[in-house]
């Protein structure tokens, strides 16, 4: 059995401006974070082989969890340091495909972010959460941060505003785009052999989910094309086991919260590169539906509840070897997300985001929206297996709230009000080196 050691280091400086305050943090770029891995395989006979993969992620600081009070992003200590990304074995047959078992990527992992260019390592066009979306929301009315967080905490395990709304909470509550699968599942997965550029895969994992995906790679007419579509369903279980966030949970009994979930999602993406000119286009989209949201006590008696989420994103530019060092990438991008209600979060009547600070009730999240406009440049250095990059993103957010009958509980039967949020500007510059 062979052994190959591989990995990468991806560290950056991240500048942010939330409309009132700005700063620069040194972070691990979570678009493709620092990691080290071990993999190997061995032939059993002419048609069969077996192998394994173990991969460990490394974060010195977390680019998607840092906030105005916490440069490292370690409000949850598990968000920095080491984490297990892969630990599985596989058996593969040339004619019938492969089966793998253990902690690994699901069939739909990265299905909405297929990308043949250098931007996949530092500015994923559809997974915008990874660049600065741990920042707390700042009210555009009073200039204060959500959760009234104004001074550092003395706690070793939390920072002020940990219970407040961050940018990522506006994207399906967890920050992952609708339609996208995940890594770090305990699952069994089947992958078919390639037929005319197409491969199919399916996975099932605890507790419980399953998904299906179809991918294509090929070249024709001077274009390199990579594309994929996938469908996934969470049928039961606690979200910390499945890693998929459904915004609603089932009620075991009226007024009693349960950890059960049930949602399904569909997504896909395509990446096209014109080999002669280097012009490229990456595009992705996805939708998620939450079957339990309308069964929540908060929304069960309320008309007009939206239990869906959707997004689309596009990135286009040119990637070509203009100099002897390696490829240069210049691009622009746009991302748009629209989401419905959320039963996991509330805004208190005294919060900075409250539309009516004098109200006797809190607020339910009725709808969210995120728009991102971005651009960037990167330079590859082939001899060093390194890419230097600079990316910029301007983030505009929408937050709509609906009054609760109680401060933090009861049906959302009150008025619908907007909660204006300050725009955010984000700049990331750094390098990734692979080995």
Language model features with spans:
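Outer membrane beta-barrel
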Residues: 2-14, 24-211, 215-221
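Transmembrane beta-strands of outer-membrane beta-barrel proteins
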Residues: 3-11, 46, 50-54, 97-99, ...
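Transmembrane beta-strands of outer-membrane beta-barrel pores
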Residues: 11-17, 56-60, 105-107, 204-208, ...
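Surface-exposed strand-loop-strand hairpins of Gram-negative outer-membrane beta-barrel proteins
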Residues: 14-31, 249-261, 416
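Outer-membrane beta-barrel proteins
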Residues: 16-20, 61-65, 110-113, 236-240, ...
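Hydrophobic, lipid-facing positions within transmembrane beta-strands of outer-membrane proteins
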Residues: 32-36, 85-89, 184-188, 198, ...
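Detector for outer-membrane/organellar transmembrane beta-barrel domains
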Residues: 213-380
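Outer-membrane beta-barrel "beta-signal"
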Residues: 421-435
């Amino acid at each position: 059995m062979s052994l190959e050691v591989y990995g990468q280091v991806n560290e950056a400086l991240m500048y942010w401006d939330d409309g009132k305050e700005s700063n620069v943090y040194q972070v691990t770029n979570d678009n493709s974070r620092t990691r080290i891995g071990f993999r190997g395989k061995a032939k059993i006979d002419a048609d069969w082989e077996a192998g394994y993969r173990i991969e460990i992620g490394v974060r010195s600081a977390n680019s998607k969890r840092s906030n105005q009070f916490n440069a490292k992003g370690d409000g949850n200590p598990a968000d920095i340091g080491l984490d297990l990304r892969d630990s599985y074995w596989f058996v593969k047959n040339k004619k019938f495909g492969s089966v793998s078992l253990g902690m690994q990527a699901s069939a739909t992992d990265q299905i909405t972010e297929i990308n043949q260019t250098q931007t996949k390592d530092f500015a994923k066009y559809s997974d915008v959460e990874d660049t600065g979306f741990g920042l707390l929301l700042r009210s555009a009315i009073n200039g204060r941060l959500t959760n009234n967080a104004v001074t550092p905490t003395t706690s070793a395990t939390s920072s002020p505003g940990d219970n407040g709304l961050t940018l990522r909470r506006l994207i399906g509550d967890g920050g992952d785009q609708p339609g996208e699968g995940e890594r770090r599942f305990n699952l069994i997965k089947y992958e078919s052999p390639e037929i005319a550029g197409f491969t199919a895969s399916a996975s099932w994992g605890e507790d419980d989910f399953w998904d299906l995906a179809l991918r294509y790679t090929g070249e024709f007419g001077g274009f390199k094309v990579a594309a994929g579509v996938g469908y996934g369903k969470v049928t039961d279980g606690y979200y910390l086991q499945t890693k998929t966030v459904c915004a609603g949970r089932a009620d075991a009994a009226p007024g009693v919260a349960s950890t059960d979930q049930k949602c399904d999602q569909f997504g896909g993406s395509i990446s096209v590169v014109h080999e002669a000119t280097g012009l490229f286009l990456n595009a992705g989209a996805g939708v998620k539906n939450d079957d339990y949201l309308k069964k929540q006590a908060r929304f069960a008696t309320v008309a007009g509840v939206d239990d869906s989420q959707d997004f689309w994103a596009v990135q286009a530019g040119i990637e070509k070897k203009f100099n002897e060092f390696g490829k240069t990438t210049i691009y622009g991008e746009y991302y748009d997300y629209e989401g419905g209600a959320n039963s996991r979060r509330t805004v208190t009547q005294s919060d900075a985001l409250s539309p009516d600070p004098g109200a006797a009730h809190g607020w339910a999240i009725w709808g969210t929206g995120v728009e991102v406009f971005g651009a960037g440049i990167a330079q590859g250095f082939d001899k060093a297996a390194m890419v230097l990059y600079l990316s910029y993103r301007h983030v505009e957010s929408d937050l709509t709230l609906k009054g609760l009958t109680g401060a933090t509980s009861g049906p959302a039967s009150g008025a619908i009000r907007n909660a204006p949020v300050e725009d955010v500007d984000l700049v990331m510059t750094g390098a990734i080196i692979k080995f």
